[in-house]
């Protein structure tokens, strides 16, 4: 019994302390008599997750633009440096029609967000290591990539809590150690530079998916029949 109470207390502390996403202890609106349970509404959690996703997308766009200005030579034809064309992953397909959007479940949305977050943790860490080998890399670019990695980890924890609250389940396990890196194709010319550019471009694209899916989930909490991805 004592061990169970201790475990419950630690779980309550963890839920209240996920940095930057779940907010401060003052946001805990409901507690059990022991003071160990911290309850934040799904709506508040989604609002904070959306804020994180919006910032991640914005900073990813800034980092990509800065990298392009600094390291992509003007002599390379535009069609060779368009990073979006190098994103070959079909891990998460965005529904197109209104009927598809209406048919997808909250579970599908949360699982998709969880997958997108997980597959990008390793590539962003590798990108930081790669940038350390560049000459005259702007400190602002290093800061932005580190910031994205940190916020992505925060978003991962927030999504886990949302899955626990909304679906009563834990994390989604990736099959066969799925990695986004093997889905990114870099041209032979200046391969490492264009590969890093492709990583930034593809991450920006998937960061927008995360933001869009979270906003759809938030809209559904209001029972709005017109919720859409577009």
UniProtKB/Swiss-Prot annotation:
One of its GO terms (molecular function) is growth hormone activity. Its main location: secreted. SUPFAM superfamilies: 4-helical cytokines. It holds the Pfam family Hormone_1. It is found in: Secreted. It comes from the Eukaryota. Keywords: Disulfide bond, Glycoprotein, Hormone, Secreted, Signal. Disulfide bonds join 28-38, 87-202, 219-227. GO terms for biological process: animal organ development; growth hormone receptor signaling pathway; positive regulation of growth; positive regulation of receptor signaling pathway via JAK-STAT; response to nutrient levels. The keyword Glycoprotein applies. One of its GO terms (cellular component) is extracellular space. Gene3D superfamilies: 1.20.1250.10. Residues 1-23 form the signal peptide. PROSITE patterns: SOMATOTROPIN_1 (PS00266), SOMATOTROPIN_2 (PS00338). Glycans are attached at residue 177. Belongs to the somatotropin/prolactin family. This is Somatolactin. It comes from Ictalurus punctatus (Channel catfish).
């Amino acid at each position: 019994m004592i061990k169970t109470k201790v475990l419950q207390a630690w779980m309550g502390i963890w839920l209240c302390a996920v940095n930057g996403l779940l907010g401060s202890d003052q946001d805990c609106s409901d507690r059990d008599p022991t003071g160990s349970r911290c309850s934040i509404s799904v709506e508040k959690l989604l609002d904070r997750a959306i804020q994180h996703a919006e910032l991640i997308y914005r900073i990813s766009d800034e980092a990509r633009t800065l990298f392009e200005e600094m390291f992509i030579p003007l002599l390379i034809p535009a069609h060779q440096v368009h990073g979006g064309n190098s994103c070959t992953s079909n891990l998460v397909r965005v529904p197109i029609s209104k009927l598809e959007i209406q048919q997808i479940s909250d579970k599908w949305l949360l699982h998709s967000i969880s997958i997108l977050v997980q597959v990008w943790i390793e590539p962003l860490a590798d990108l930081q290591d790669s940038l350390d080998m560049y000459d005259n890399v702007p400190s602002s670019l290093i800061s932005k990539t580190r910031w994205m990695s940190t916020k992505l980890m925060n978003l991962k924890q927030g999504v886990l809590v949302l899955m626990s609250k909304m679906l009563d389940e834990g994390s989604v396990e990736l099959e066969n150690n799925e990695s986004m890196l093997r889905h990114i194709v870099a041209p032979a010319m200046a391969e490492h530079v264009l590969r890093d550019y492709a990583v930034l471009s593809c991450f920006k694209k998937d960061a927008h998916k995360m933001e869009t899916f979270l906003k759809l989930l938030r809209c559904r909490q209001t029972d709005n029949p017109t919720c859409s991805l577009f």
